[in-house]
UniProtKB/Swiss-Prot annotation:
Pfam families: Actin (PF00022)
Keywords: ATP-binding, Cytoplasm, Cytoskeleton, Hydrolase, Nucleotide-binding
Entry-linked InterPro entries: Actin (IPR004000), Actin/actin-like_CS (IPR020902), Actin_CS (IPR004001), ATPase_NBD (IPR043129)
Family to which the UniProt record says this protein belongs: Belongs to the actin family.
Entry GO terms, CC: cytoplasm; cytoskeleton
Listed name of the protein: Actin, cytoplasmic
Organism: Euplotes crassus
PROSITE patterns given in the database record: ACTINS_1 (PS00406), ACTINS_ACT_LIKE (PS01132)
Gene3D superfamilies (UniProt xref): 3.30.420.40, Actin, Chain A, domain 4
Highest taxon listed in the record's lineage: Eukaryota
Example GO molecular function: ATP binding
Protein EC: 3.6.4.-
Functional description taken from the UniProt entry: Actins are highly conserved proteins that are involved in various types of cell motility and are ubiquitously expressed in all eukaryotic cells.
Length: 379
């Protein structure tokens, strides 16, 4: 789409702890997906980049400079913690990836559940003062995942790179007191995979090596329906072994690690974590809600985020929830094949609705009421 054709088209940006998804409203997929990472030179000397001297690199740029740079993640556990770094990521998103003139487009940003008020106000102020967007909106990621699944009531299990949230939603509004979260997600699974591969004398310690392990995790891992039975099957010589070609050409044989890694979500104690499992988290969230909405929540468990993409995860969660739920309760887990982009797609759909046109926070609203307007309009 040319800039002319795209004039006034809303921009949708889903800022995740590990990955940014960005694109134009009305599209089915984000046109730009890159790591939420800022790479800064380890020494004070500025690195010469393709576009002249640069004091930092963002997204895919940082891959080429990995050895001489320190990596930082501006978003920690779903929350923006480093605003300078975040602005570098937004610069890269708008000008390098989407190549837009920001004053010509509304922008919809996503946020984690229970995002602090100050964070929302900062996002609002930066979009208007630094980028001159004509209008903006902020929506909770889990609500957008629910819209993406064609529902307004349900419970979203959203697991990305840095955090796993379970968010119950009734008629489009989150139920804040029942939101659950654990700091156990994709990055932790990658680290755990490094540990269990180390037991077999494979050592993955550098950033580049961890990227390899992440790729192994995403391509070969799956969730066992019954963990103990799967271990027994492996011990009896079951056909579980797969081979992965390492960057240096050596083959890596992997068998039980394929299901041991994602089992961490269902048995956190395996990796030495004292936190709730993903199914206990979901059950506790539902049981904290009013009795009259629980039935709708059990019947609409929506998976969202890249860490829910393991084959077998939806089936295992269904089995665990069926065991925990009252016997007569109908349990349904909805696992869309492209759920890693569910949040972005929900934003793309919302921003395109004609009924949404009056919901935007405009530059005029901001001039009159200041950044606190975001709490009145983005609810």
């Amino acid at each position: 789409m040319s800039e002319e054709e795209n004039a006034k088209e809303a921009i949708v940006v889903d800022n995740g702890s590990g990955v940014v998804k960005a694109g134009f409203a009305g599209e089915n997929q984000p046109c730009s997906v890159f790591p939420s990472v800022v790479a800064k030179p380890k020494t004070k000397q500025v690195i010469v980049g393709g576009a002249g001297n640069k004091d930092c690199f963002v997204g895919d740029e940082r891959q080429q400079k990995r050895g001489v740079c320190t990596l930082s993640y501006p978003i920690k556990s779903g929350m923006i913690k480093d605003w300078d770094g975040m602005q570098k990521i937004w610069d890269y998103t708008f000008y390098n990836e989407l190549r837009i003139e920001t004053e010509n487009h509304p922008v919809l940003l996503t946020e984690a559940p229970l995002n602090p008020k100050q964070n929302r106000e900062n996002m609002c102020r930066i979009m208007f003062e630094e980028y001159d967007f004509p209008s903006m909106y902020i929506q909770i990621q889990a609500v957008l995942s629910l819209y993406s699944a064609g529902r307004t009531t349900g419970i979203v299990v959203d697991s990305g790179d840095g955090v796993t949230h379970v968010v119950p939603i009734f008629e489009g509004y989150q139920i804040p007191h029942a939101i659950e979260k654990i700091l156990l997600a994709g990055r932790d699974l990658t680290d755990y995979m490094c540990r269990i591969l180390k037991d077999d004398d494979y050592h993955f310690e550098t950033t580049a090596e961890k990227e390899t392990v992440r790729d192994i995790k995403e391509k070969l891992c799956y969730v066992a329906d019954d963990y103990e039975a799967e271990l027994k099957k492996a011990g009896e010589g079951g056909e579980l072994e797969e081979s992965y070609a390492l960057p240096d050409g050596r083959p890596l044989k992997i068998s039980t690690q394929r299901f041991q890694c994602p089992e961490f979500l269902f048995q956190p104690d395996l990796g030495g974590r004292e936190c709730k499992s993903v199914h206990q988290l979901t059950y506790d969230s539902i049981m904290t809600c009013d009795l009259d909405v629980r039935k709708d929540l059990y019947a609409n468990i929506i998976l969202s985020g890249g860490t829910t993409m393991f084959p077998g995860l939806g089936e295992r969660l269904y089995k665990e929830m069926k065991d925990l739920a009252p016997q007569t309760m109908k349990v349904k887990v909805i696992a869309s094949p492209d759920r890693k982009y569910a949040v972005w797609r929900g934003g793309s759909t919302l921003a395109k609705l004609s009924t949404f046109a009056g919901m935007w926070v405009t530059k005029e609203d901001y001039a009159e009421f200041g950044e606190s307007i975001v709490h009145r309009k983005c609810i």
